[in-house]
Structures are given as structure tokens and as C-alpha cells.
Curated annotation (Swiss-Prot):
The gene is PAPL. Belongs to the poxviridae poly(A) polymerase catalytic subunit family. Pfam families: Pox_polyA_pol, Pox_polyA_pol_C, Pox_polyA_pol_N. Heterodimer of a large (catalytic) subunit and a small (regulatory) subunit. This is Poly(A) polymerase catalytic subunit. SUPFAM superfamilies: Poly(A) polymerase catalytic subunit-like. One of its GO terms (biological process) is mRNA processing. InterPro entries: PolyA_pol_cat_Poxvir, PolyA_pol_cat_sf, PolyA_pol_nucTrfase_Poxvir, PolyA_pol_nucTrfase_sf_Poxvir, Poxvirus_polyA_pol_cat_C, Poxvirus_polyA_pol_cat_N, Poxvirus_polyA_pol_cat_N_sf. Keywords: ATP-binding, mRNA processing, Nucleotide-binding, Transcription, Transferase. Polymerase that creates the 3'-poly(A) tail of mRNA's. GO terms for molecular function: ATP binding; poly(A) RNA polymerase activity. It comes from Deerpox virus (strain Mule deer/United States/W-848-83/1983). The active site is at D192, D194.
């Protein structure tokens, strides 16, 4: 045995390590040493400041916080399972090496906020948005409750923290969804704050510990198999606190964004196209049927932003939007005629099964596919004047083998997202797709082609039970 390593392990475990413990944990001795020398008093001071600033309504005393912190940092002394020890070491290491820079810094004085005047009066867009959504309000209301609707009582506290986090870490974290639109239009209400970031796992682990030490709650992190690079933080009642998509720095650099009050939000043009794409998903149409007013103000805000930015004249002249498309139901591939626009391809093959797309890209022996992760939810490849991509939502049919206009528009929006992320000019097709929303009549749904079914196991990080599964 190496005496130095053995002493580090003994100090950490509060006992002389067994031969098994020594040989399995010696590779972790540097991380264990970091935990051993970690200044818990300074850490507790940061937790207290975070509590005062973001969780002041939580009734927890300083002595209770101290006990929770010291209990966790001595937990290994009562743990003999090697697997659990590895989990404790991994989580403690993340906490001692990242917490100060990620969450501790939020309690210090931040940079001055440069107030933005990017706010929109959407009154002129309300009727257009209302009429457009009314023409798409064709789903039957479902009684099922989606997981995203079960909201934790901690959401308001975490939202307050997230607003500061987005300002301090605006190079690595941006937001989209209702909060980002609230920044454009304060009339829009929001629930939790939707974020994309480059260090999602580390951030959520640090946040989980902050909540644990302030509330005593056993919060858990879940990784969902059918959503790539997605993690959600849930409280002890299995209610949603916050979720986050992790993206590469390269993807972050591709995303068009605007700065409002020191917070970067995904460019509302991308958000409008994503909404048009999302409306092809049947459960989103069910949400529309339940609460049309909620979506109308968001839709109107996005339309007003795009109208202003691109100087769009709203006259109902949609030209070739949605782009003509046909479906092969057996192969689950849609062919879109894109030749009417100045794209680098004349047609697009839209796959409804991601594995089929991946297989065909491999068979093409092409290595220049691009993947914008959760921003587009698909890889893209241009080969021989054809764009190959994947569409992750349901496809609505309005007749036998006839794609419903809602889905056809959603697919066209998906293609425009690719064009925008590649920094190509989309002003003409964007003008057409916006005008394709005007003067439409309701078309009933004839059939629903299901979305791609993802398989796999949920990953979990449970601090209380010392579990990490991938």
C-alpha cells in the first residue's frame, strides 16, 4: 500500500480502509483529497447567502443547514458498498470543484444590467394569431395529464435563481419558451424557465444539493431516454422543478440569439418556426384546445417580432408555403419539393424514424452531416441536391395519404430552422410561411401517423440513495 494514499483514504472514510476499499478507491485519491480539504465553513456561508437571496421563504435555520452539509460530507463513514462510495465521491467532487463558480457566484454583485427596449405591442397581431390558431384548433381534448404539468412549489424560488444565473452565465446558458417571450412581452405569463446550456448535468447536480441543504428534501435528477441530452430535476413529490437540455458549445455558437437585460434568448424567429413545427404534435393541439388564449398571446408576440425584423407584409400571399409534400406511409418517409426556393437542394427526404435516417446517411458514405441537437431535434445532410432529415412529431393526415396542412407547414418550418441555423437567408420563405397562416379554414384530422418511438431506460441521480445510473 502507498502510505500517502492510505492516509488520504483513512481520513476520508473515518476508518482504516480494507484491502478492497484501498485497491478500488486508490484511483480516486486526488478527488478524495479535494473533498478532505474542502472548506465547509465557506461553503455553508455560500449556502446561507443563496438561501437569503433566492429561498428566503423557506423556514430552515443555520444549524439545520450545517447539519445537512456535515451529514452529507461524512456520509461515506457509514457506507461500505463500493458502488455507493463511488457515487458519493463523484457527487462530492462535483460539489467541491464547481459549486462556487456555478451557484456561489450568484450571491456576489453582478455586472450592471443594460435595460433593453425590445418589447412589442402585439395588439395588431392578436386577430391574425387568434384566427390562425382557431383554424388549427381541431383536436379532441384529452384527459391525460402530462408530466410537465405537475409543478413543484419550489419553481418560483428556482426561477428567481435562474434569472440571475442566465445573466451571469450567458455564454453557456440561454433560454427559450414562455419566459423568453415574457421578456419581449410582459403580459405573457410563464411557469418554469426553459434553458439550453453546455454544462447541464453539473448545474443540475449543484442545484439539487442547494435545494437539499436548504429544504432537506430528497430531490432527484432523471434522464429521459426519448429526449436526447435532457435532464429534469424533481422534488420529493415527483413534481417538476426545472429541466435542461445539454448542448455542445459548437451548437451554442450556431444558435441565433438576442440579448435582453443581459440574458440571451433563442431568436424568436427560431421559436416561431419551432412552434409551427410543434403544432404537428397531436398532444400540443390538445393543449391548444384546452387553453387557446395562452398560446394566442405567445403566437402573436412571435409574429410581431418576425414581422418587424423581416419587414413582412401580411397579405395572405403564401406562394409555395407550405412546400408541397407527399408521404410513403409504409416507409415512413415524406418527400418535400423544395425547388421553389433558393436552397442548396431541390428536395428533402423527411424520415419519421431516426434510426432509418442514420442508416441511410451511413450508406451514403457522407461525413458532412450536421446535428444541432435539441435545437432542431435532428441531424441534417445535403447530398446530391437532396436534404436528409428527421421529424420527431406526429404527422396529421387530412385524407387518404394526404398530409394535413398543419403537418406540412410544420415540416416546412423544420427545414427553415436548418436554413436559419446554417446562417442562410430565410426572408422569402419565412414571409411565405407566415402568410400561409392567414385566411385558412379548419380541416379535420383524418388519421394520425405516430411519432418515432424511442426505447431505453431512465437514468437517475439520487443523492439520498447514492445512486447514479446512465
Amino acid at each position: 500500500m502507498n502510505r500517502h494514499i492510505s492516509e488520504i483514504l483513512e481520513k476520508y472514510l473515518g476508518r482504516i480502509p480494507s484491502l478492497t476499499e484501498y485497491h478500488t478507491l486508490k484511483s480516486q485519491y486526488k478527488n478524495i483529497h479535494r473533498v478532505n480539504i474542502f472548506n465547509k465553513d465557506i461553503f455553508i456561508s455560500l449556502i446561507k447567502k443563496n438561501k437569503k437571496k433566492f429561498f428566503s421563504d423557506i423556514d430552515t435555520s443555520v444549524s439545520e443547514i450545517k447539519k445537512l452539509v456535515f451529514d452529507y460530507f461524512t456520509k461515506q463513514e457509514q457506507t461500505y458498498s463500493i458502488g455507493k462510495l463511488y457515487t458519493i465521491i463523484e457527487l462530492q467532487t462535483i460539489l467541491v470543484t464547481t459549486y462556487t463558480d456555478i451557484l456561489g457566484v450568484l450571491t456576489t454583485k453582478g455586472p450592471d444590467i443594460f435595460s433593453s427596449n425590445v418589447q412589442y405591442n402585439t395588439s395588431s397581431m392578436q386577430k391574425i394569431a387568434n384566427d390562425a390558431l382557431n383554424s388549427m384548433n381541431i383536436a379532441t381534448i384529452s384527459d391525460k395529464v402530462m408530466g410537465r404539468h405537475n409543478v413543484s412549489s419550489l419553481v418560483c424560488n428556482v426561477n428567481s435563481l435562474m434569472e440571475e444565473y442566465l445573466r451571469r452565465h450567458n455564454k453557456s446558458c440561454i433560454c427559450y419558451g414562455s419566459y423568453s417571450l415574457h421578456l419581449l412581452n410582459p403580459e405573457i405569463k410563464y411557469g418554469d424557465i426553459d434553458i439550453l446550456q453546455t454544462n447541464s448535468r453539473t448545474f443540475l447536480i449543484d442545484l439539487a444539493f442547494l435545494i437539499k441543504f436548504i429544504t432537506g428534501y430528497n430531490v432527484i435528477l432523471l434522464k429521459v431516454p426519448y429526449l436526447k441530452n435532457y435532464m429534469v430535476l424533481k422534488d420529493q413529490n415527483d413534481s417538476h422543478i426545472i429541466d435542461s437540455f445539454n448542448i455542445r458549445q459548437e451548437t451554442m455558437q450556431h444558435i441565433p440569439k438576442i440579448l435582453i437585460d443581459n440574458i440571451y434568448i433563442v431568436d424568436p424567429t427560431i421559436q416561431l418556426l419551432s412552434m409551427l413545427k410543434m403544432l404537428s404534435q397531436i398532444d400540443r393541439l390538445e393543449d391548444l384546445a384546452k387553453n387557446p388564449d395562452k398560446l394566442t398571446i405567445r403566437f402573436a408576440t412571435l409574429l410581431e417580432y418576425v414581422r418587424n425584423k423581416y419587414g413582412i407584409i401580411l397579405n395572405g400571399n403564401s406562394n409555395n408555403m407550405p412546400m408541397p409534400s407527399t408521404i410513403d406511409i409504409k416507409k415512413r418517409i415524406i418527400t418535400v419539393d423544395t425547388k421553389y426556393y433558393n436552397f442548396a437542394y431541390d428536395k428533402c427526404y423527411v424520415y419519421l424514424d431516426e434510426n432509418s435516417l442514420s442508416s441511410d446517411i451511413l450508406s451514403l458514405n457522407a461525413d458532412d452531416a450536421v446535428d444541432f441537437e435539441n435545437v432542431s431535434n435532428s441531424a441534417f445532410l445535403v447530398n446530391d441536391k437532396t436534404l436528409y432529415t428527421y421529424f420527431s412529431n406526429t404527422i396529421l393526415l387530412s385524407g387518404n395519404d394526404k398530409i394535413h396542412e398543419i403537418s406540412s407547414r410544420g415540416i416546412s418550418a423544420h427545414i427553415l430552422i436548418y436554413q436559419a441555423l446554417m446562417k442562410y437567408d430565410i426572408s422569402i420563405p419565412l414571409t411565405d410561411i407566415v402568410n400561409s397562416l392567414i385566411g385558412r379554414n379548419k380541416q379535420p384530422i383524418y388519421e394520425i401517423i405516430p411519432r418515432d418511438k424511442k426505447t431505453g431506460k431512465h437514468g437517475i441521480i439520487d443523492i439520498e440513495k447514492d445512486i447514479i445510473t446512465h
